[in-house]
Structures are given as structure tokens and as C-alpha cells.
Swiss-Prot record:
Pfam families: Glyco_transf_4 (PF13439), Glycos_transf_1 (PF00534)
PANTHER family named in the record: GLYCOSYLTRANSFERASE WBBK-RELATED
Transmembrane segments: none
Protein name (Swiss-Prot/TrEMBL): GDP-mannose:cellobiosyl-diphosphopolyprenol alpha-mannosyltransferase
Catalysed conversion reaction: beta-D-Glc-(1->4)-alpha-D-Glc-di-trans,octa-cis-undecaprenyl diphosphate + GDP-alpha-D-mannose = alpha-D-Man-(1->3)-beta-D-Glc-(1->4)-alpha-D-Glc-1-di-trans,octa-cis-undecaprenyl diphosphate + GDP + H(+)
Key word Transmembrane helix present: no
Organism, scientific name: Komagataeibacter xylinus (Gluconacetobacter xylinus)
Keyword Glycosyltransferase attached: yes
CDD domains to which the protein is assigned, alphabetical: GT4_PimA-like (cd03801)
Gene name of the encoded protein: aceC
Length: 393
């Protein structure tokens, strides 16, 4: 690869992250959509460098791969999944104009501390930082106040993927911080929700502790006290919880017979599950952006959400749904039942309203914003034809 590029030549960008497809999650999906838009619509030669396993699954993935047209290189690693070590990353960055690091982990710190050796132009996207769970929280807080601010200095810009991330990083990344909210694939699940109003809740994503699915099961138990027609479908893949763990939680809440778990659904299968539901549920303790909620709204589902910052922002933008206080589920359950009872008259209006809010989160626009940021930090323009195509989106 040529390490030196003229302004009229293809820009080479290496996206670096610890997990990518076939792993499933908000970060993985966001990066897939961004890199795909960059390659297909902006003429940016975007590649991905990641680790060679899906956390929680046995086996190794191929060292070289192509995912949806995106070249992928995977590295062996050691240590903990919370901070996986892969120092050989330095062997793979030489031919790129810009390194785009995703999330705050080993790659973020190591590439910063070795910057005097490689001297690459770098930006980083936050994706929620590393506060997705309470695990090791005290250590994380100390790290975030001491190590992270030093690492930040090696990056031209730190991109908050949500306004809650911007609040989190505003002190450690002062002067470098900008906000570019994530987008969604607007065609993936658009208008997929059931046309027949019902009391089925769909939850989808990783089976992870911070998603607080047990809390959602407790809410369903309260809802079933109002109307026995309430049930829940949980679709996703094992993470730090398994499908058996979820069944045990549902059993403890008395709703085992009202739960259906679908492991590892394809997009087509997930779209089909949306066609069985009227509601989407997520009572997560933390979300960097809330990708699944926005995707659910694009399908026309009515969201039932915890009162964390990214979800509150969706409601402020006009989403039609229910915000639940995790410390007091009863009022949220009452509101959800009232909304379900009114669906025969209100479903079409709620569907249109939620789809409209979701339509504002478009990956083509997000990719264009990142392209402008790349121009800024590199001090050079992308080819005019590419930027004109981006502006036409």
C-alpha cells in the first residue's frame, strides 16, 4: 500500500474495533453501515481491523474476510474481553491515511500511546465509552479520569455518538469533542410492525446484563395482571447471559409461558417477528445511542423504554411511547396498558409518528458528516465527485 496519497486520490480509512460482524450489537451494526456507505456512496476505501473471535462463542474467524463488500482483517488477542490485547495492530496500519478507532478500549489507548512511533492521523468514536455495565465500575471511573484524558491527546477529534456520550466525554475531551449521532439502515425494518394491534412486546439485541431483561419481564408480569393477552418475544444472541438464563429469569417472574426466545435471527426473521408485535421493549441501564429503539420505531413499533438520556431524547423529538421508571414499574405498566387498549383507534397515527422520528437518523447523512470531518482533520478535500454524490443524498 502507498502511505502517501494526493488530494485527488482515493482516501484510505481503517476502522478499528474489538468486535465486528458476525458479532451482533449496536457498535457492530453502526460500523457496518458507516463503512458500507463510505465505500458505496463516497468512494472512500474503508476497511475494518478487528479481533478474530466473537466474544462468548467458541472458535476463530478467518484472518482475512470480506463482509458486505468491506475488507476485514482479524487479529488474534489475549487477556480479557473487557480489555483485549492485540499489540500487533501496529503491523496493519501503515498504508492508511486515517485511523478511525471505535469505542474506548485497548486499541484506543495503545494507538494513542504508540503515536510517536506510527504518527497516524486518528479520530475516535465513543459508542458509549466503557460504562455499559456496572462491572469494575470503580476501576473504570479511575481509568476514565486518569488514563483516558492522556490517550485523548493523540486524537484529532473525539466523536460522541450520542448526546449522552457528549455529556460523559465533555471534560476528558474538551476542545476535541464533537457530536455525530449514529444512524440506522432506513430500509432494513421500515414499516414492519404488525398491522393488527396487539399486546406483544418485541425485545431484540444481545442477551446482556445491562439490557435488564429481567426488569422487562417484571413489567410484563404487571401488564398481564391487567390483561392476559400480553406476551413478549426476545430475539438476539448470547452475551454475558444465555437463553437459558433468560428463561430462568422469566420463570422467576411468573411469565415463562408468555415468553418466546429466538436465538440468532436473520434480518428477515427479525422483520417477521416485528410483524407479530405492536410494541418494542428496552429497559436498559445504559445505551450509547439506542440503535435498537430507533430501528423498532422505523418499523412502526410503539417503544416502551427506560428513562435514560438517549431514550428521553427520542421522546423529546416526538416519539410516541412509554417511559418507565425502573424503580417504580407500576405507572409505566398502567400507561402501556392504556395505550394498548386505545390501539384500535390510534395505531396508524402512532406508527406514522414513530416512523417519522426514526427517519431523521439516516446513515447516508451520517457518513457525509464523517467525510467532512475526515477532510477537516486531514486538511485536504475528498474528490469533488464523491462529495457531490454525498451532498445529493
Amino acid at each position: 500500500m502507498n502511505s502517501k496519497k494526493r488530494g485527488d486520490e482515493t482516501l484510505k480509512v481503517l476502522h478499528i474495533c474489538r468486535q465486528f460482524s458476525p458479532s451482533v450489537g449496536g457498535l457492530e451494526d453502526s460500523l457496518l453501515n458507516l463503512a458500507r456507505s463510505q465505500r458505496q456512496r463516497l468512494g472512500i476505501d474503508a476497511e475494518v481491523l478487528t479481533l478474530d473471535t466473537v466474544f462468548g462463542r467458541p472458535g476463530k474467524l478467518p484472518h482475512r474476510d470480506v463482509v458486505d463488500g468491506i475488507p476485514v482483517t482479524r487479529l488474534a488477542w489475549r487477556g480479557s474481553t473487557k480489555y483485549p490485547l492485540a499489540p500487533q495492530v501496529l503491523r496493519h496500519i501503515g498504508g492508511f491515511d486515517l485511523l478511525h478507532v471505535h469505542a474506548i478500549d485497548f486499541f484506543f489507548d495503545f494507538l494513542a500511546w504508540t503515536w510517536p512511533l506510527h504518527r497516524k492521523t486518528m479520530i475516535a468514536s465513543t459508542h458509549g465509552g466503557f460504562f455499559h455495565t456496572g462491572a469494575l465500575r470503580r476501576i473504570k471511573e479511575i481509568w476514565f479520569r486518569t488514563i483516558t484524558p492522556i490517550s485523548v491527546r493523540a486524537y484529532k477529534k473525539i466523536v460522541a455518538c450520542s448526546y449522552s456520550d457528549a455529556d460523559l466525554f465533555r471534560h476528558v475531551a474538551a476542545g476535541r469533542l464533537i457530536t455525530i449521532e449514529n444512524g440506522i439502515n432506513q430500509t432494513r425494518f421500515r414499516d414492519a410492525a404488525s398491522r393488527t394491534p396487539n399486546r406483544t412486546i418485541l425485545a431484540f439485541g444481545r442477551f446482556a446484563v445491562h439490557k435488564r431483561l429481567k426488569l422487562l419481564f417484571q413489567l410484563v408480569a404487571l401488564l398481564r395482571a391487567y390483561n392476559s393477552g400480553w406476551n413478549i418475544i426476545v430475539a438476539g444472541q448470547d452475551s454475558n447471559l444465555t437463553a437459558d438464563d433468560l428463561r430462568a429469569q422469566a420463570r422467576a417472574c411468573g411469565i415463562e409461558d408468555s415468553l418466546r426466545i429466538v436465538s440468532g435471527p436473520s434480518d428477515a426473521e427479525l422483520r417477521g417477528l416485528m410483524g407479530e408485535a405492536s410494541f418494542f421493549g428496552c429497559l436498559s441501564a445504559h445505551e450509547g445511542f439506542g440503535l435498537a429503539a430507533v430501528e423498532a420505531m422505523s418499523a412502526g413499533l410503539v417503544p416502551i423504554l427506560s428513562n435514560i438520556t438517549p431514550f428521553a431524547r427520542l421522546m423529546q423529538q416526538g416519539a410516541a411511547g412509554v417511559m418507565v421508571n425502573p424503580d417504580n414499574l407500576a405507572p409505566g405498566a398502567r400507561e402501556a396498558e392504556d395505550m394498548a387498549a386505545a390501539l384500535p383507534e390510534t395505531a396508524d397515527a402512532l406508527r406514522a409518528r414513530n416512523m417519522d422520528v426514526a427517519s431523521r437518523y439516516d446513515w447516508h447523512s451520517v457518513a457525509h458528516e464523517y467525510a467532512r470531518l475526515y477532510q477537516q482533520v486531514l486538511g485536504r478535500a475528498l474528490p469533488e465527485a464523491n462529495m457531490a454524490a454525498a451532498g445529493a443524498e
